[in-house]
């Protein structure tokens, strides 16, 4: 589990048109691509994609997560943190959250995913609608120690199906960035 953030840490999540610090074109393409990241990573790894769970459980959601989901601050939710891996290398740190009340009524069993990708589930159910992609430089303090670094790009979006909303944040780790540059030039 990543450490709980100090109250003063709050990233500024921006839409594409709000970016001032614009990443290079290849990274911009990956950050704002609307397709399934799971499928894209599977292609990039030539079928060597896997999910490595780090933490799953109930906890108070972060301020930015509550705001994005329209919840009262410090609402409790299910938190799932995983590495999305390509050929046994950590490519993405993903944190997915949903409010307890929405999960209890929404018929999504996030606690039963195990090593299955949440993205696979969300993109296979046409009832889920994806909201706007937003990006930021993810706070180093929010990352697991094994991959903590400054200035890593992250994206997030909200997936909604009726009253159920799941907020998915994906942090692009250096190993993915290196692989993208080597194998997937724009």
Curated annotation (Swiss-Prot):
One GO molecular-function entry: chorismate lyase activity
SUPFAM superfamilies (UniProt xref): Chorismate lyase-like
Main location: cytoplasm
Top enzyme category: lyase
Any one of the GO CC terms: cytosol
Positions bound to substrate: 80, 118, 170
Pfam families named in the record: Chor_lyase (PF04345)
Subcellular locations according to the entry: Cytoplasm
Pathway annotation: Cofactor biosynthesis; ubiquinone biosynthesis
EC number: 4.1.3.40
Source organism superkingdom: Bacteria
Catalytic activity: chorismate = 4-hydroxybenzoate + pyruvate
GO biological process: pyruvate biosynthetic process; ubiquinone biosynthetic process
Keywords from the UniProt entry: Cytoplasm, Lyase, Pyruvate, Ubiquinone biosynthesis
Family: Belongs to the UbiC family.
Its biological purpose: Removes the pyruvyl group from chorismate, with concomitant aromatization of the ring, to provide 4-hydroxybenzoate (4HB) for the ubiquinone pathway.
Annotated protein name in UniProt: Probable chorismate pyruvate-lyase
Gene source species: Pseudomonas savastanoi pv. phaseolicola (strain 1448A / Race 6) (Pseudomonas syringae pv. phaseolicola (strain 1448A / Race 6))
């Amino acid at each position: 589990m990543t450490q709980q953030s100090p109250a003063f840490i709050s990233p500024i999540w921006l839409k594409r048109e709000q970016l001032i610090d614009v990443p290079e074109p290849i990274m911009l393409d990956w950050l704002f691509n609307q397709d399934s990241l799971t499928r894209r990573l599977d292609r990039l790894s030539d079928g060597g994609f896997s999910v490595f769970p780090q933490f799953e459980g109930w906890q108070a959601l972060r301020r930015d997560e509550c705001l994005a989901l329209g919840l009262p601050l410090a609402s409790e939710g299910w938190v799932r943190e995983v590495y999305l891996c390509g050929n046994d290398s950590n490519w993405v740190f993903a944190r997915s959250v949903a409010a307890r009340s929405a999960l209890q009524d929404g018929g999504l069993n996030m606690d039963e995913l195990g090593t299955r990708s949440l993205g696979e589930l969300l993109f296979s159910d046409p009832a889920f609608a994806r909201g706007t992609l937003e990006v930021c430089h993810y706070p180093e303090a929010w990352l697991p120690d094994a991959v903590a670094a400054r200035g890593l790009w992250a994206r997030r979006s909200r997936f909604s199906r009726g009253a159920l909303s799941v907020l998915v944040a994906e942090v692009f780790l250096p190993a993915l960035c290196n692989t993208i540059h080597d194998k997937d030039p724009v």
